[in-house]
């Protein structure tokens, strides 16, 4: 078998492997507690004018302020130039002020849509595929239960004194392109 055939076969099997892994989910009392804590965070979070930075898949960097509560996201970029992303429910609109372009995005098959349910529920249609702990950090990865190959969202929280604070969202789309959003001013 040639190298090209091996790569092609591997690429064809990848969605099946992702589906198998995501379908297993995370089990155990500790994992259930972590999931419940993250759900509780999303039930009460109400970010307003939170500074953020974003690294796009091509390495370009942007920054601005965002507002978020379950079912709603508004990102106002100030760098590299004024842009907005407004997402509510199942749709998002990206507006680039420099070009005047407006792009409408359906979120039913987009990883970002995992965070726009109201309330956010980490079960049923959403599968927690991985939970990791480091000192002062809780990390959860999420995928759509019915089609995990559509993308993955990894959430990183500061975990101090039993309180969670979201500080990073890493989104991997169906083409394995990575976008990283970091909350905070530095």
Where do the model's predicted regions map?
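Flexible, processing/modification-adjacent segments and terminal tails
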Residues: 36-52, 56-57, 95-152
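An acidic-aromatic
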Residues: 65-114
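Bacterial N-terminal signal peptides that target proteins for export
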Residues: 2-12
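Gly/Pro-enriched, hydrophobic low-complexity segments
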Residues: 123-124, 130-186
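Short, solvent-exposed coil/turn segments at beta-strand boundaries
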Residues: 44-46, 67-73, 87-91, 157-166
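Bacterial N-terminal signal peptides
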Residues: 10-20
């Amino acid at each position: 078998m040639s190298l090209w055939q091996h790569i092609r076969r591997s690429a064809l099997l990848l969605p099946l492997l992702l589906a198998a892994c995501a379908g297993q989910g995370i089990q155990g009392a500790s994992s259930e507690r972590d999931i419940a804590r993250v759900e509780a965070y999303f039930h009460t979070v109400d970010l307003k004018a939170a500074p953020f930075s974003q690294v796009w898949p091509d390495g370009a960097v942007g920054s601005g302020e965002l507002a978020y509560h379950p079912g709603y996201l508004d990102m106002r970029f100030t760098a590299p130039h004024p842009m907005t992303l407004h997402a509510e429910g199942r749709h998002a609109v990206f507006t680039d002020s420099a070009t005047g372009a407006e792009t409408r995005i359906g979120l039913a098959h987009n990883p970002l849509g995992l965070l726009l349910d109201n309330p956010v529920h980490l079960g049923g249609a959403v599968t927690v595929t991985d939970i990791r702990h480091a000192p002062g950090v809780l990390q959860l990865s999420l995928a759509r239960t019915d089609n995990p190959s559509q993308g993955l969202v990894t959430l990183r929280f500061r975990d101090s004194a039993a309180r969670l604070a979201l500080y990073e969202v890493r989104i991997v789309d169906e083409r394995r392109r990575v976008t990283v959003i970091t909350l905070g001013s530095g």
